[in-house]
Amino acid sequence: MRSMIRTAASAAAMLVTISASGAAQSDKLAADLVKDIGDLETKVVGLAKALPEAAWAWRPMAGTRSGAEVFQHIAADNYFLPVFLGVSAPEATGVKSDYKTAQAFETRKATRDEIMAELTKSFAHLKQAVLATNPAQFPDPISMFGQTYTRQQVLILTATHLHEHLGQLIAYARSNSIKPPWSD
């Protein structure tokens, strides 16, 4: 997780530079991220609905997450990463600023319906967190996992993390002969 975060954050730093006079760019970045997260939500939730219950338990090999575990991981991190931006996770999740709380949420026993509901709530929380982050503060440094990142890097990390797991879920679906709902 930490190496993925460092890699994504480094890529984000190289790809997007916002100057002090770039407030409009910052506002656009936030709007673009919310749109992207919304598109990701549609696809992730669409795959969750398309996968039959048996496929939720499927994993490509030992030591990898099952489909259900990937969905729970996404929900957990949708709550966890905004904590570093100053947006607390809903109290009922138990997710705080330490990774152990996110892991506890991620590995809790939950039914398919509970996971589906939590996915939807977690995406709403993440989009709200992006919008709650003042674009003027995007360059501000924050500490996460013992590293220093800008708020902007953390915001971009949330989207890159979701894209990574969407790709994983597409592979899981296709390995189970399930065509992603948006795919022709």
Task: Briefly describe each language-model feature range.
Residues 1-12:
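Bacterial N-terminal signal peptides that target proteins for export
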Residues 34-45, 55-100, 141-184:
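Short, contiguous alpha-helical
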